[in-house]
Every structure is written in structure tokens, then in C-alpha cells.
Amino acid sequence: MEKWFRNWKSQFLLVAVAIGVVLAAPLASPNKAAADSVIISGARSLSDQVVVNFANGRNVRTTDVHVLAFNDLHGTLDPAGNNLYGRFAGGAAFLSKMVKDRQAAYANDVTVLAGDNIGASPLQNGLFHEEPITIASNLMHVDFASVGNHEFDKGSAELMRIQNGGCHADGCTGAPYALPGGGSTNIYPGADFQYLSTNVVKNDTGETLFPAYATKRIKSDSGKKITIGFLGEVLESTPTIVTPTGVAGLTFQDEADAANRVVQNAKNVGNAEDSPDTWVLVIHQGGFQSGTAVLNGCAGNLAGSDIAEIVQRLDPRIKVIISAHTHAEYRCTITTNGVTRLITSASSFGRILSDVTLSIDDKTGELVSASATNTIVENALNASGTGVIRQPDPSKADPEVQAVVDQYVAAAAPLANRVIGRIQGDLTRTASALGEQPLGDVIADAQLATTQPAALGGAKIAFMNPGGIRANLLRSDISPGGEAVGEVTYGEAFTVQPFGNSLVTKTMTGLAVRRLLQQQFRTGVASGSGPPCLGSTAPAGGRVLQISWTFRYESNPDAAACADKIGKMWVHNGTAFVELADTDSLRVTMNNFLATGGDGFTVFRDEASDALGGAQDIDSFVDYFRAAEPAGIAVPALNRIIPKP
């Protein structure tokens, strides 16, 4: 059970805690320049650092290890349309350039990604079964990755293929991939980095799906061997946001409990002297800054977030947390029971790189202090802004990864660059105070139009989950195909809806629809910590379904009782809106993810009947654009969800 990994000046031990097996062996690496001999582009001064000191006043000699971290790349090969803090940012080649520059500068480093490297991908990656972004990550010399919820979109067997290599059931569609000794093959070689799954267990064996933790060993400046342990986790609630087939046969454990168990038992596995002296948790769960986010800030200190609750229960030996999932950026410290921890997150789509410095005691191997800086991964000569067209800066891209990007952009171009229609204005995911989104309205309208005919479902209303809407459609965005302003390509539409879900139409009562809408919220104020309504998994702030034009309802997310959050409901009968009574029955369309209770909307699964399957969501979306020609799709008014008196 051995596998060789790219490595920089160290030796890895990958430990499957459940079975105590060594899974990898050492690999020699090129020399690196001293860290103080290279200027890192984009690095900030030490005055911008938040340093967490664990030495308790002790004066000790230390060795620095840099942990380079990113998350939620979601197969973003080409960076078109991504920006942050007024800068065009992200994309695999540009992220790779920054990562490689820092790897070359540091004497000791580890590169990790915190989940969702694959899944919900643009067409150029999704069309080739997530292989391109994995190859790009190999070229970045990523060492370890936590699994994210989207790693399970296609099931654990497909995730194992992503790790180990081999062709997809559709055939060997990628490449050609270079062979180490020369020549090439069209057989996908797998990930050179190791996925970790501390809290994901196979039901049939009780073992973790991937190794529960991995270690990196370095020599301190005084010659002592130092071992750093890396845990890799995903949110425990993954089964509520992934299709049931994606997580079949797996149990997702409490994050803190699983991490603590591994840390506490580590000395009992393998050679005791290889047990980590310092621990880093790489976890696909996160939080948000409150108010206006700052690149290296922590407004609100993650109060009330899922990641804060987990961090507060961690073993004191876990002092550095690389987090993810929320697509937010922050650099925070949280102190619990006298233990202060450093927590980072690097936004999404390769727009930010987190650089965490671990200062480790040369003699004991214990963590003395930790600091971190988030840096924007810029990719253009110009600043971003409304209506501004990006001017790419090739000097900021890694040529090796750019070649991969160019290869797959070209391969997907005949399909990706096909113009499917036009938009009259920007269709965004920006929500009203009650949670309605312009782009969400349009998607729900498209799915209704597809399933309205009696033979295709006879739908009266349609619902869309907000998490399935992955990107905005902006008039000024120009894809590699060079379409005109306002034109929408198939590739852009696919980026908005990349999951390949199919439409399902079911019969529901008015009461079931009311209960469904209540499941959007928690008890008490929407932003509070009350229990979710009717057994749902609604987060703080709610999870508001997007609705078709044929449906209206009154909403008060802050009502104390779940039963009081939804008021009157109306449905269009073909002539006018009429009130929907609890005793009425009607046909309702959703995607197959929602139909099976996804996102905690169990009413779709348990209180609906007579299911009829239908078209794929992307096909419905494309057909809707074509039907709107030549005028194009207008930006809808946000008047479908109205305040409850």
C-alpha cells in the first residue's frame, strides 16, 4: 500500500488510524533557496501579521515551517468573472504561480487544500470529470487535501478514482498525460497529493475512507527531527447537502470528536517517535466575518459560526486550523479555556492564498507561535469594476499550469463558446432582504417552463435551492470565445448550474408547501441559534428557496415560532393569482437533489408523491434562453417573496 508523492525536503507518513498502516514512503526533492534570499510578490510586512504565541514567555530557538493553503477551488481553471476587493483574481495558473514562488523561497513548507477542489465546476473541468483541476493541483505540488462535501458529488467510488487514477466509466476522455520516463498516456494518473478524511468512516469496515491524518517530518536548525501532523475533515452535515447516492455507505462523524480521538491515540499507532509534536487541522467547514469583510480581518470573530463551535471543543494540541466551505476570507484567533488558536480561510476559486508560519521549538518540536497572511491572487493588469473587461497579465501565471488550462479550454471550446442567448442586465445571486435572487428567479422560471406541459409534469410552481446556483451572469463578462457584451455562452450557463441534476415533479398539498417554506428557517430570529424548523438543517440566516413567477408568499423570517414565519400564499391559475389553501393540491417541480431531501428540505421527500422525472437542469436553462430570443432575458423584479404583515 505504498504511493510516492511529490515532496519538498521532507518525508511523509500517511497513517490510517483505524488500521495502523504506513501508506507512503520518502521521496527526494530539489534544494530550495533560503527564505530570506527571495522577495515574495504580494507578501505583507510583519506589521500586518497576527502572531499567536504559545511559548508562555520562554526564550527558545525555533525553526519556521510555512503552510500554504487554499480551498474551494471548484475546478476553476480559467479565472474569467472572478474578482475580489476591486481586483481580478483567481484561476489555477495564477494561484500556481504564487504557490510555486513561495515554495521556492521557503526552506520548509507544506501545501494543503481544504476541500471542494472538485465539484460544482465550470464546463472546462466538469466536462472531463474533474481530471484537469487535479492535474493542475499536482503541478502545484499540493501535499495533502481534506475532503469537502463536493468531493462526494459523484460518490466515494468516483472520489477514489480521482485519488488513485484510471479512466471514468465514460472512457478515457482527458489528456494526453505525460509519463515520467517520456511519452504520454490517455489514462488519468490520479492525484499526487493525499486526501485525508479524519471524520469519514466506511460503514462496512469501520475504517476511515482515506487516511485519518498524515505527517510531515523536517529537521530543525539544531538537527532534531520534527514531526507535524495534518488532520483532514469535512463538515459532519455533508449527508444533508449531497445526494444520498454520493454518501452511501459512509458515516460522517462529529468533527471535534474525531479530531480529538486521532490526536489522543496517535502515539499508539506505528513508531511512537513519529507521533506529531505539532498538529494542524485542515477542515472543510467555516464561518464569515460580520459586517464588511477585510482581507486579513476577523470582524465578529466568527461568533455563532459552525467553525467556532468546533474549534472551542478541540484538543489543546490542535492550535492551527485551516478552514473552508463558506467561500469567505478571514484570519482569526479564538481563545477557549486558556488556549488560543489561529484560524484562516482563503475565499474560493483560487482568489486568495493563505500563508501560515509555524515557529517550532528546535528541541521539543512543539509549536511556539503561529502567524498568517492572506494574499489576493491577482491575474490582470487592470482593476476590476462594473463593466470593466479584464486585461490578463501572463506574467502572473505559471506556464506549466497555464498549458493545462489552455489544453482543456480549447478542448471544451466548441461546446463552451456556443452562444445560447442574451441578458438585458446582470443576473446575480445578490438576495433581497427576504432571500430572493434575480438569477434564482430566472432558474426557477426555466424549470417551470420545462415541466408545465401536462405530459412533462403539469407543474404549477417550481423551486430552486440557492446552493445550486454557482455563479452570476454579468453582461460585461467575456469568455474565451469572445462573445459580444450581453451574450451568454453554454460554458457560462454550465458554470451557473454545473451539477447535472435532473428535474422532478411531484404532487404536494398547500400545507406541505407551507411546511416546506418553514424549513427554510430556524426557530426565533433568522440570524439566531435556535433549532431549525421542522427538522431541517437551515443555517443561521436561513436557506431561502428560489421560486417561479407563478408563486407568491408572505415571509417573516424573524417570527418567534416556525408556524408564524409564513403567511398567505398565492399561485397563478393561468389568469390571475389566487390564494393557495392548505387543503389544495398542486404539481411542484424541484431538482433531484431537493427531491431526496437535500439541504434538509425533507418535506420534498416525505410529503410529496407521484414523482415524474424530467430533463437535466442545464438543458432546461439553455432552452429557456433560446426561447427568450431575440430580446433576451430581463432582470426580474424581486417581488415574489413579500413581507408578512
Residue ranges and their predicted role:
Residues 25-37:
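C-terminal region of N-terminal signal peptides and the immediate post-cleavage residues
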